C-alpha cells in the first residue's frame, strides 16, 4: 500500500538544526535553496568555479561557495547537478569532504541506482524528488502550497534518514501537497520510462508523425501544427485536472468517439511491446550505459540527435506561428528554435 505523508508527519526543526549545501543552481537547485532559506534552514549553494549561476544565486541573497567548501561546511548535501556530471562532481569535490554522520541527498536516483556514485557506509543516503519543474516548486511554495514529492532512503546508518528526508521535504513545501514513499530504484526506473516512452520521447514522436501525415497529404503546415501540437496543451491540462475521464467528458461526442475507435489503431498492441523493450533497457542498465558512454565521449550521438530534431519542419512552422501568440511569455534563458542549454 502506498504510504503518504503530510505536514503533521514531518518535523521541520530537524532540518532547521542541520547545515545544508545545495549543489547546483538550475531548475531544482534554485527552488530548493530559496525555499530552504525561507523555511529557516542554514543553507549555502555549491557551484563550480566560473559557474554562470553564481551571480544569480548571490543576487537572490544566497551564500555561494565552491562545491568542496560547501560540502565541508555542511552535514546535509543535496546534489542537484545534471545526471551525467554528478559522478565527476562527487569524485572531485564531494567524496573527500564527507564526514561520518553526514547525509547525502539526491533529487533523482540515477547515479545511485546505476552505481555511478557509491557513498561510504557511514553516510545517510536519501532522495527528495519534487514531481514538478523547479519554477513550479518555488511558485507553489511562495503561494503557501506545495508540489508532491517522492522520498526514499538507500542508506540509514544514523537511523534518522527517513525523518530527515521528511523534514527536508517539508522545508521545500512537499508535505503541504503530500509525500510518497518510494525507493531509488522505483523512482529512477519509472521516471526514465515516463520520459522516454510517454512524456518526451513518445509524445514528441507522435506529434511529429501526426504533422508529417497531414502535411504529406497536402494540408497546410500551419493548420497541421495547430491540430497536432498547439491544442495538445488543452487536452493535457484536462487530464491533469481530472484524468482521462475528464478529458473525454470535456470534448465533443465526435472527439470522444474518435478517441475510442481510432486511438487503438494508432497506439496498438505492438506499441506496448515496444514500451516493454524500453523499460527492459532501463531496468538492466542498457540505457544508462549508452547515455553515460556517449556523454563521456563528448556526446556525439546526443548532439547529432538534437540537431536532427531541431531541423524538423514542425519547428520552422512553429517559430512563425508563435509570433502570433501575444500571450506567450518569453523565457530569457531560452533561444527560440534551439534545444542546446
UniProtKB/Swiss-Prot annotation:
Q: Which HAMAP family match?
A: IlvC
**KARI C-terminal knotted domain: residues covered:** 183-328
Q: Which Pfam families match?
A: KARI_C (PF01450), KARI_N (PF07991)
* Name by which UniProt lists this protein: Ketol-acid reductoisomerase (NADP(+))
The residues annotated as the active site are: 108
Sites binding Mg(2+) 2 sit at 191, 227, 231
Q: Name one GO molecular function term.
A: ketol-acid reductoisomerase activity
The cofactors required by this protein are: Mg(2+)
What keywords is this UniProt entry annotated with? Amino-acid biosynthesis, Branched-chain amino acid biosynthesis, Magnesium, Metal-binding, NADP, Oxidoreductase
Query: What Enzyme Commission number(s) apply to this enzyme?
Result: 1.1.1.86
- List residues traversing the bilayer: none
Q: Does the keyword Oxidoreductase apply?
A: yes
What's the catalysed reaction? (2R)-2,3-dihydroxy-3-methylbutanoate + NADP(+) = (2S)-2-acetolactate + NADPH + H(+); (2R,3R)-2,3-dihydroxy-3-methylpentanoate + NADP(+) = (S)-2-ethyl-2-hydroxy-3-oxobutanoate + NADPH + H(+)
Its biological purpose: Involved in the biosynthesis of branched-chain amino acids (BCAA). Catalyzes an alkyl-migration followed by a ketol-acid reduction of (S)-2-acetolactate (S2AL) to yield (R)-2,3-dihydroxy-isovalerate. In the isomerase reaction, S2AL is rearranged via a Mg-dependent methyl migration to produce 3-hydroxy-3-methyl-2-ketobutyrate (HMKB). In the reductase reaction, this 2-ketoacid undergoes a metal-dependent reduction by NADPH to yield (R)-2,3-dihydroxy-isovalerate.
Q: Does the keyword Cytoplasm apply?
A: no
Residue span, KARI N-terminal Rossmann domain: 1-182
Pathway involvement of the protein, from the record: Amino-acid biosynthesis; L-isoleucine biosynthesis; L-isoleucine from 2-oxobutanoate: step 2/4; Amino-acid biosynthesis; L-valine biosynthesis; L-valine from pyruvate: step 2/4
Question: Binding residues for substrate, per the UniProt record?
Answer: 252
Indicate which residues the UniProt annotation says bind NADP(+): 25-28, 51, 53, 83-86, 134
InterPro entries listed in its UniProt record: 6-PGluconate_DH-like_C_sf (IPR008927), KARI (IPR013023), KARI_C (IPR000506), KARI_N (IPR013116), KARI_prok (IPR014359), NAD(P)-bd_dom_sf (IPR036291)
GO BP, one annotated term: L-valine biosynthetic process
